[in-house]
UniProtKB/Swiss-Prot annotation:
It holds the Pfam family Ribosomal_S3_C. This is Small ribosomal subunit protein uS3. Keywords: Ribonucleoprotein, Ribosomal protein, RNA-binding, rRNA-binding. GO terms for cellular component: cytosolic small ribosomal subunit. HAMAP family: Ribosomal_uS3_B (MF_01309_B). Residues 219-283 are annotated as: Disordered.
Amino acid sequence: MGQKIHPTGFRLAVSRNWASRWYAGNSNFATMLNEDLKVRAYLKTKLKNASVGRVVIERPAKNARITIYSSRPGVVIGKKGEDIEVLKSALTKMMGVPVHVNIEEIRKPETDAQLIADSIAQQLEKRIMFRRAMKRAMQNAMRLGAQGIKIMSSGRLNGIEIARKEWYREGRVPLHTLRADIDYGFGEAETTYGIIGIKVWVYKGDRLANGEAPVIDVASDDDKKRRGPRRDDGKPSGRPRAPRPEGQPGAAAPGSAPAAKRVRAKKPDGAVDAAVSAEKAGE
């Protein structure tokens, strides 16, 4: 049966880029990858209320650069930049190299898949109905320019004993199209009944690796298939019939009147009864 591949990994080097951009040899790769995982887990816990969409980690020569995309950059920076300095010192101690932290603002948080998933998870933890939270998020995303959105929740929805899945979709979400810009996000809501998982797919249009929209050839009117003649009832007819040549049976002579239609005479009811009675008498 078909499975849903991760949309970001499916489009790497086509219309998406890596979230960790560095190179390491075989001896240092595992150590640096473990550092990245620790940094992401720390930022997720530290900046839980800052609406962080994604984190990009780059490692130039003997230092590191971390870019945090957030819809609330003021919460990350703090009053007079105090929080950002504390964050920078903690990351430097964790990674062992000087760290530069950049903050990028997300202009439309309603169309960011990760922020939508986190928002729905927070609402579910506050005992808000999952259908209401999902439909409200879909309406806000479509209103602000998304061409399609799909949201799926799975777990003990509304506290039922048997876990199930429910999903809603609005617009187009072409997951098989590589040039489609699909933003994917995942979140978890820790409720009293258990963990509920939220997956969000947002379709923002088509784009290529350089950020440009692809050029789609539109067929001209001459290239389109012409339709056949129409019937009297208004429906298009199929293959046009060729006229019969002269001299063949069924072909009318030129200039002659149309042949009269044969009509079989119907016997009266009395004659039929008389014939039946005569047959019985003969027997």
